[in-house]
Amino acid sequence: MHEMSLAVAAIDLAAEQATQRGFNKVTALWLEVGSFSCVDPDTIAFCFEAAAKGTVVEGAQLHFQHQAAEAWCYDCDKTVTLTERGQACPECGGYKLRVAQGDSLRITDIEVS
């Protein structure tokens, strides 16, 4: 379950940013989850709640934003949207693809008080 380590990293980063700026509470956190990130939002929410106990992030609302996977096709020189790993290019049917976005998890916003 890699979601626990991801949740802990997000908590640590949010807490660090809040305290560096003189805030003592993180009230909400927005995470962008790529469709190829292999991150389950329900699992990371569970891990987030458990790992946040006793930190300035405890009780913060967790919001998820979905990011579609996009790839560059070397065969047709187009950026295409993909729905699953291993999929052929929807434009030309080629398999020479490089994922350009949608394979990551990142914090997009932090709300503090």
Curated annotation (Swiss-Prot):
Family listed: Belongs to the HypA/HybF family.
Superkingdom, taxonomy of origin: Bacteria
Classification via NCBIfam families: hypA, PRK12380.1
General function of this protein: Involved in the maturation of [NiFe] hydrogenases. Required for nickel insertion into the metal center of the hydrogenase.
Annotated residues for binding of Ni(2+): 2
GO annotation, biological process: protein maturation; protein modification process
Signal peptide: none
UniProt keyword terms in alphabetical order: Metal-binding, Nickel, Zinc
Residues the record lists as binding Zn(2+): 73, 76, 89, 92
Protein name: Hydrogenase maturation factor HypA
PROSITE patterns the UniProt entry points to: HYPA (PS01249)
Gene3D superfamilies, per database record: 3.30.2320.80
GO molecular function: nickel cation binding; zinc ion binding
Organism of derivation: Aeromonas salmonicida (strain A449)
